[in-house]
């Protein structure tokens, strides 16, 4: 928990991606606490400070939904903003629709999705813009259900550099350089071997037709070069009654890292607006 919440403001809970990506990158949003609201982040079960492995039966949406509910109860939080990035946004959508919990001032759906099928389709569309060699390596790996080849690894790395994030260097923020205990098992059994082949427990995730059940205002944020393509983001925007969409030009899957100033400004203005300030 970073900072304290001033009277008239609500804290913000951050849900990281993956599953299994850890909270580390969210430390880039510590500065949000300077405006007088606590920023709450945690490592979901299966990674970081909550690392567990050898229990593939755990890696279901229900596990992480129950964990989020337990966190909110434990901290006695009765009003808050909820930000989910990538998989974390999927978890936020599940929470908002299945729990219909009171006290959520707003939700921020950052580079996320309402349908695994649409997500996979869009990733495959973008793969077609890659070199023929990379396309062939990915297609062969998927056809054989074998993602162990060096050619596939290189192709997947190229894809992620294009649409997820750049390489971490000595000049990157410390929270990105810091060694993390990623949840490889949680990712594999929860999502799949990569971003475009959902084979895990989230493979049939689809809340597109239920987005209208979300009763809180939602800010959709994504990048033009994002894994969360404009079509994926627009599907969220179109389906949620009270929604706004901010598109970061030139950003990949983590606009809060690549365009931190703009991201924090948009985020803070949104939360203040929803608190009636």
Model segments located where?
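Conserved catalytic-core motifs of eukaryotic protein kinase domains, centered on the activation segment
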Residues: 24-26, 50-56, 119-121, 231-232
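Conserved loop-alpha-helix segment in the C-terminal half of the alpha/beta-hydrolase fold
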Residues: 201, 208-251
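Conserved hydrolase catalytic core segment
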Residues: 78-122
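Flexible "cap/lid" loop of the alpha/beta hydrolase fold
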Residues: 105-146
């Amino acid at each position: 928990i970073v900072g304290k919440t001033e009277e008239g403001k609500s804290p913000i809970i951050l849900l990281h991606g993956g599953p299994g990506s850890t909270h580390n990158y969210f430390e880039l949003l510590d500065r949000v606490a300077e405006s007088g609201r606590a920023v709450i982040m945690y490592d979901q079960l299966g990674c970081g400070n909550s690392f567990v492995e050898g229990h593939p039966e755990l890696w279901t949406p229900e596990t992480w939904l129950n964990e989020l509910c337990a966190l909110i109860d434990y901290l006695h939080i009765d009003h808050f903003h909820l930000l989910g990035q990538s998989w974390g946004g999927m978890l936020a959508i599940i929470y908002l629709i299945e729990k219909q919990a009171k006290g959520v001032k707003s939700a921020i759906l950052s580079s996320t999705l309402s349908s695994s099928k649409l997500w996979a389709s869009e990733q495959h569309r973008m793969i077609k813009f890659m070199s023929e060699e990379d396309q062939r390596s990915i297609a062969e790996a998927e056809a054989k259900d074998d993602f162990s080849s060096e050619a596939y690894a290189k192709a997947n790395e190229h894809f992620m550099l294009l649409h997820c994030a750049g390489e971490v260097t000595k000049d990157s923020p410390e929270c990105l350089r810091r060694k993390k205990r990623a949840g490889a098992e949680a990712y594999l059994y929860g999502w799949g071997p990569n971003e475009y082949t959902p084979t895990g427990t989230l493979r049939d995730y689809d809340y597109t037709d239920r987005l209208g059940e979300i009763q809180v205002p939602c800010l959709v944020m994504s990048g033009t070069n994002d894994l969360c393509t404009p079509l994926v983001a627009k599907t969220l925007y179109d389906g949620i009654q009270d929604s706004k969409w901010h598109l970061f030009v030139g950003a990949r899957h983590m606009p809060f890292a690549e365009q931190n100033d703009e991201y924090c400004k948009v985020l803070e203005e949104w939360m203040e607006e929803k608190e009636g300030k």
